[in-house]
């Protein structure tokens, strides 16, 4: 009974009554781009609440309050002819917890790789793309590119073929980094945009080979071979 009373008057209960909503909670961040042929886009975001808090125990076993988070994934479809896609992420998620956007994610991944290697499978998952830390969101380090109101990212990406002994051949797309990080600062009243237009170059396919006990190596399109590694060095692709 006491646990029910506690729940009924907690943030969890009121968040259940007045949940996150992505409808009509402008202003909006417009996300647009072009997904290369044989790929599909993904757009999602993480929202943070400083109203609804949770407890966390530190290394000294002392409890302290921390913010809570809510994830939002959008159903985004690219135009089958042009690859163009567009979506809108709400800045506010509303609700009892007063959600505000903290991070935005945009990426592309393969849907079909049979045109490159017939017996390979596509990786699926999040593919390659960008993460935008919004305003004062906690960053991974100090190396993020800082942009104001509009983030425009147009990398060259490549297919990577992974041949691991005992597993099917695997093809996935990558840029120089799996995810590029940005700090996106938003000015009230301005137009907010995230643009992601990768160019897929399928003329160059690095190959990763992983064996059981016979080593591992990466072979580059020009014939160069780097042994003892599974990491592709993009300096050798261009």
Model feature map: region roles:
Residues 31, 101-109, 198, 230-234:
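Short, hydrophobic/proline-enriched secondary-structure or compact coil segments at domain edges
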Residues 41-156:
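Structured domain cores in non-transmembrane regions
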Residues 25-29, 39-41, 83, 102, ...:
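Residues at beta-strand starts and edge strands
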Residues 1-11:
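Hydrophobic membrane-insertion alpha-helices, especially the h-region
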Residues 13-30, 37, 57, 231-237:
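Beta-strand-rich domain onsets/edges
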